Regions:
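Non-catalytic, conserved peripheral segments adjacent to functional cores
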Residues: 1-40, 59-63, 68-121
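Conserved SET/PR-domain catalytic core that frames the SAM/AdoMet-binding pocket
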Residues: 39-58
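N-terminal Rossmann NAD(P)H-binding glycine-rich loop of SDR-like oxidoreductase domains
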Residues: 123-144
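SDR active-site strand-loop-helix element
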Residues: 127, 152, 176-180, 219-224, ...
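Adenosine-cofactor binding site in Rossmann-like domains, unifying the SAM/SAH pocket
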Residues: 148-167
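NAD(P)H-binding glycine-rich loop region in Rossmannoid oxidoreductase-like domains
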Residues: 162-200
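Catalytic helix-loop patch of NAD(P)-dependent Rossmann-fold dehydrogenases
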Residues: 195-207, 227-267
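A short helix->loop->beta-strand "cap" motif at the edges of active sites that frequently abuts
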Residues: 214-217
């Protein structure tokens, strides 16, 4: 059947040949576009996440191989989407008539393109959802009817605790917005507050950056102008860190850790 899966796929043929057909099931103007070609050992193809994949083997002893960039899981399987091989609107010229091909019972009952469900984008996780910024993000998401957002605070996901990361299937996420932080500037100067500030503002972002880098997730990290000494009215990307207190120092350390994630944005509030 034509299955769109929630990962990228690289397909090659070790021997023999196949007729391949791909249907774009991602939301947008390209939804429903079809591409077909014959693959043999001289040609491979990259199939992006959300593009439906199907093929017919054209020779005996054909060996079809593929590499994907995520592990199968039940949660991942729930995000699959499909379109029917026989949909006349796809105009796929199958070299082997479908009535002579081997198809599963499920393949026979997949929806036509007009009823097919677009592949949903990967989820967005928001940390620190009970803080001032987190509540504002949730309010915006709700007001605009945005889908695919998941909100966590320290009671559901303490992102400064390494042991909590294995609870999540990170391949399901495309973006993490880190709105969580220890923001009690004065209390950060106390012995107890100092430890809490460094845990939330430095260790937590470092752990988020690592998991985001491992899973090609975009990390949006909210920082502060406290990482500077206040000698300039306006701050640009080239200004060096010069924090004066524990809060600013811990935030600067977190910012440095976040830059190790290839796909990151750092936003500074003031």
């Amino acid at each position: 059947g034509i299955h769109a899966e929630p990962w990228d796929k690289y397909i090659s043929i070790a021997s023999g040949s196949v007729f391949g057909a791909w249907v774009d099931l991602r939301p947008g103007d390209s939804f429903g576009q079809v591409y077909t070609t014959i693959l043999d050992p001289s040609k491979a193809i990259y199939v992006p996440r959300g593009v439906g994949n199907s093929f017919q083997a054209l020779e005996d002893d054909t060996v079809y191989t593929y590499l994907v960039n995520a592990h199968w899981s039940l949660e991942q399987k729930k995000t699959y989407t499909f379109v029917n091989l026989a949909d006349p609107d796809l105009h796929i010229q199958w070299p082997i008539p479908l009535e002579d091909s081997e198809r599963s019972e499920a393949d026979l009952h997949h929806p036509m393109l007009k009823d097919a469900k677009p592949m949903a984008p990967r989820r967005t996780m928001v940390t620190g959802c009970n803080g001032q910024l987190g509540r504002a993000i949730r309010s915006y998401v709700d007001a605009h009817g945005l889908e695919g957002f998941e909100f966590n605070d320290i009671d559901t996901f303490d992102f400064s605790d390494p042991a909590q990361y294995d609870r999540f299937d990170w391949s399901l996420y495309g973006t993490v917005i880190n709105a969580g932080a220890y923001t009690a500037v004065d209390k950060a100067e106390t012995a107890e507050g100092r430890a809490l500030a460094w845990k939330a503002n430095a260790q937590g972002p470092a752990l988020l950056a690592r998991v985001c880098a491992e899973h090609n997730i975009t990390l949006v990290h909210v920082s502060s102008d406290y990482v500077f000494d206040g000698s300039r009215e306006l701050h640009d990307e080239a200004e060096a860190f010069a924090p004066l207190g524990v809060y600013g120092q811990s935030k600067a350390a977190g910012d440095i850790a976040v830059t190790n994630c290839p796909r990151h944005y750092i936003l500074r509030s003031s």
